Amino acid sequence: MGYLFEETLSSNPKTPIVVDDDNELGLMAVRLANAAAFPMVLKASLELGVFDTLYAEASRTDSFLSPSEIASKLPTTPRNPGAPVLLDRMLRLLASYSMVKCEKVSVGKGERVYRAEPICRFFLKNNIQDIGSLASQVIVNFDSVFLNTWAQLKDVVLEGGDAFGRAHGGMKLFDYMGTDERFSKLFNQTGFTIAVVKKALEVYQGFKGVNVLVDVGGGVGNTLGVVTSKYPNIKGINFDLTCALAQAPSYPGVEHVAGDMFVDVPTGDAMILKRILHDWTDEDCVKILKNCWKSLPENGKVVVIELVTPDEAENGDINANIAFDMDMLMFTQCSGGKERSRAEFEALAAASCFTHCKFVCQAYHCWIIEFCK
């Protein structure tokens, strides 16, 4: 049975807290020192299917579920009789981060019950074709392949080198994926860029009049699938390495073409570079962009979809948090990879012979940037 509440019930008595600067700083310090708990609980909850279970129930009945009810509805039924107690402990942490809503039943055992909050829709495993999902992004970020690279961070600062290579026998990320089918599949399932593209298409008009659109490093082709569904006149060419295309489904109007963007790029009226440039050094980016430039007609353009770092690290700025978090992910995952500022993108455009660089619009954490020939 689900639980419906007309009013919010207070789950905690009001406890007087001495408010002073030292106390507040101490609380912040303790929270930071224990920050590892939240992402690991988030990952386990995603793997268990907790958010999908809660969101499905909230969509149907808008009701709360007890930990026992959640356990019984998970995709894999727990064999552990203590699972509801453990789920309750995990869920109350998630509730403290406003990912789920917690209430306490005033009858019976007085147990806590939970309901999905709206933010959960961004973490649904089965929501990739709707808005995209961050679930796979969380899971891949905390996979052992990437976790092992973080252990190298101190030594890279002191001695130099490449964090990913130090952790994986000198191999770079994309070479490694050719040797690890499990991780490659997991990496290519990261699907939130679909949400970015869909959000951008609400306002971005730059694909109107395009006949042939090449997605350079397009992975499994889902970006072109979204674009061509809105612009069915466009012929899409999804261009990537053979290993990436091996898992690509078919999309109407989209052709999958294998190749290496460092060698050449298929011709098209326009091109997409979606979260590609942040994987590479400036020198490598210029090589990729020059190959794009060669394959474009006069007045052609590359539509770059990337995060743009702020010039200053503003305290409490969510965009700065995201930008610098992701920059450190690039630091540890990709040799020479980094997030870039507006000035750095303008410099890349100039070094690659493009006449100008236009920052058109923002979708979630990414900007749509046009490099115009």
Swiss-Prot record:
The keyword Transferase applies. The active site is at 278 (proton acceptor). S-adenosyl-L-homocysteine binds at residues 217, 240, 260-261, 274. Induction: By the green peach aphid Myzus persicae. PROSITE patterns: SAM_OMT_II. Disulfide bonds: none annotated. GO terms for molecular function: methyltransferase activity; O-methyltransferase activity; protein dimerization activity. It comes from the Eukaryota. Pathway: Secondary metabolite biosynthesis. Keywords: Methyltransferase, S-adenosyl-L-methionine, Transferase. Its EC number is 2.1.1.-. SUPFAM superfamilies: S-adenosyl-L-methionine-dependent methyltransferases, Winged helix' DNA-binding domain. Coiled coil: none annotated. One of its GO terms (biological process) is callus formation. Belongs to the class I-like SAM-binding methyltransferase superfamily. Cation-independent O-methyltransferase family. Involved in indole glucosinolate biosynthesis. Catalyzes methoxylation reactions of the glucosinolate indole ring. Converts the hydroxy intermediates 4-hydroxy-indol-3-yl-methylglucosinolate (4OH-I3M) and 1-hydroxy-indol-3-yl-methylglucosinolate (1OH-I3M) to 4-methoxy-indol-3-yl-methylglucosinolate (4MO-I3M) and 1-methoxy-indol-3-yl-methylglucosinolate (1MO-I3M), respectively. This is Indole glucosinolate O-methyltransferase 2. The lineage of its organism: Eukaryota, Viridiplantae, Streptophyta, Embryophyta, Tracheophyta.
